[in-house]
Amino acid sequence: MERAIFAGGCFWCMVQPFEEQAGILSVRSGYTGGHLPNPSYEQVCAKTTGHTEAVEIIFDPEEISYKELVELYWVQTDPTDAFGQFEDRGDNYRPVIYYTTERQKEIAEQSKANLQASGRFDQPIVTTIEPAEPFYLAEDYHQGFYKKNPRRYAQSSAIRHQFLEENWS
């Protein structure tokens, strides 16, 4: 099994697209990239810990490759927005691909270069590619949020889905 970590704005919106793929064993919401051990949601939202909201994905590389996960990641995000994603603003919502191995780093960097070269976006691709840091599991009420709170999830993801439809379909 392998591990991937992606930050793409609110972690509520990043779970379902990955969870629906064959070869995914788990998708957990949490926090990474900051300086405070085991931060709370409130601390991360206060923008004082340096963490991003992210998802940790455990996957079977025999069924789905890391490259496929990176490609799926792109189409869940606005890779031209370094200051958050959609209605979620601030450093804690910035887009980041966290790599756990040098091979993951190479795959992510090549994928980013390919996306930039594709001309799909007029602006530069600003998603950063950074080494993975400790991943702290978010509180239980954040896990599987789209299943537990479908109406609130639909409301909170509406702007994202509109962008994805307009730019990735």
Swiss-Prot record:
Is Oxidoreductase set as a keyword in this record? yes
Q: Which UniProt keywords apply?
A: Oxidoreductase
GO BP terms: namely:
protein modification process
One GO MF term on file is: L-methionine:thioredoxin-disulfide S-oxidoreductase activity
Reactions catalysed according to its record: L-methionyl-[protein] + [thioredoxin]-disulfide + H2O = L-methionyl-(S)-S-oxide-[protein] + [thioredoxin]-dithiol; [thioredoxin]-disulfide + L-methionine + H2O = L-methionine (S)-S-oxide + [thioredoxin]-dithiol
Identify its protein family.
Answer: Belongs to the MsrA Met sulfoxide reductase family.
Q: Which residues form the active site?
A: 10
Q: What does this protein do?
A: Has an important function as a repair enzyme for proteins that have been inactivated by oxidation. Catalyzes the reversible oxidation-reduction of methionine sulfoxide in proteins to methionine.
Q: Which Pfam families match?
A: PMSR
Q: What is its EC number?
A: 1.8.4.11
Lineage top rank: taxon: Bacteria
Q: What is this protein called?
A: Peptide methionine sulfoxide reductase MsrA
Q: What general EC class does the enzyme of this chain belong to?
A: oxidoreductase
* Entry keyword annotation includes Oxidoreductase: yes
Recorded source organism is Streptococcus pyogenes serotype M28 (strain MGAS6180)
Q: Which InterPro entries match?
A: Met_Sox_Rdtase_MsrA_dom, Met_Sox_Rdtase_MsrA_sf
